[in-house]
Amino acid sequence: MYNLTNDTELEHTYMFKWFHRRKDNHSKHLSEFKERLVMQELASLDIEAIKQFALKDWELGETHGLPHWQRVERNGIILATSEVNITVVRLFAYLHDKCRIDNGCDIEHGKKAAIMINGIRHTLLKGLTDNEFELLSKACELHTTTLRTGNSTIDTCFDADRLDLERVGIIPYPNKMATSKGEYYAKNLSE
């Protein structure tokens, strides 16, 4: 039995209970998805090259940088269902904030990212099909302005990003999530 002497210790105890419960509840989904991920290659795409491209000239630090992108990728993997194109979700994770000019309000960065990826369509993204490229472009363009699209891949991209809003002090509202799995995780973030 723990002797909790202050609110901080109590808070940490609840945090770890939530973490362990969440991990236990979703290990089936994770193992199922990891199996799919191993089976689905990134075609001729080199995710490390995409990461390096995203990091090139990055000046805004970690709030919207690599640690955030890695969490978005992880969230997307957890949220993905069989109809989601995981290649698009993983690319979105590293490219959606590439064109941010500040860590505050930058509503146009999604549109700028969509324009930017057109510039790498025939180099870093040459392995994408036209459909995958269109999904990636729309996900980047709309991720700050659109609640949901009805497309499972794009909506998974949105929720993967939204589930990391706590890093900037914003708790994602379950009813503002684009997918049912995103809604579930948003409801259970505080447990």
Region roles according to the model:
Residues 4-45, 55-84, 95, 105, ...:
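Divalent metal-dependent phosphate-bond-processing catalytic cores, especially two-metal-ion Mg2+/Mn2+ enzymes
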Residues 87-98, 112, 116:
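A short glycine/small-residue-enriched secondary-structure motif
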Residues 84-91, 124-144, 152-153:
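Acidic/histidine metal-binding catalytic segments
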Residues 72-76, 108-123:
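An active-site-proximal "capping" alpha-helix that borders the catalytic cofactor pocket
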Residues 100-108:
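Catalytic Zn2+-binding segment of zinc metalloproteases
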